[in-house]
Amino acid sequence: MSSRSIMGFDYGTKSIGVAIGQELTGTAQPLRAIKANDGVPNWDDIEKLLKEWQPDLLVVGLPLNMDGTEQEITVRARKFGNRLHGRFGKQVEFKDERLTTTDARARLFERGGYKALDKGSVDGVSAQLILEAWMEEQYG
C-alpha cells in the first residue's frame, strides 16, 4: 500500500462535496462543499484545494440508480471527472456512490441532530464516504 493522498468529490448540480484521504491509513476527512451553478463548479475553488492539498489521485462518486443503471446525473458526474483530468492532469477514478448521502445524513444526525444536517456538511461527509469506500475496495 502506498502513501498517496486522494481527494474525493461528491458531484451535484448545486454543490460538490470534497474530502481528502490517505491511502496509508485508509482514512478520509470532509473538507467542504464547493458551490455549483447547474453542475458547473467554480474551477478556481477546485484549483485552490488541489494546490493546498496536493492529491495524487482524484475519486469522483458516480450516482447510479439502485439497480446499477446510469441516469442523467451519472453522465454529468463522469463529465465532471473527465474535466478534472483535462484541466489539472490528475488521474481520476470513479466510485459507485449509491446511498452515500443517506449514510452521511445518518452519521451527521448521530453527532449533532438536525442542526448538523446543513447541505455543505452532508456533501463533505458524502465525499468522505465515497473515498473510504474506494479505499476499502482497493485494499480490503
Swiss-Prot record:
GO terms for cellular component: cytosol. Its EC number is 3.1.-.-. Keywords: Cytoplasm, Hydrolase, Nuclease, Ribosome biogenesis. Belongs to the YqgF nuclease family. GO terms for molecular function: nuclease activity. SUPFAM superfamilies: Ribonuclease H-like. It comes from the Bacteria. GO terms for biological process: rRNA 5'-end processing. Could be a nuclease involved in processing of the 5'-end of pre-16S rRNA. It is found in: Cytoplasm. Pfam families: RuvX. This is Putative pre-16S rRNA nuclease. Its main location: cytoplasm.
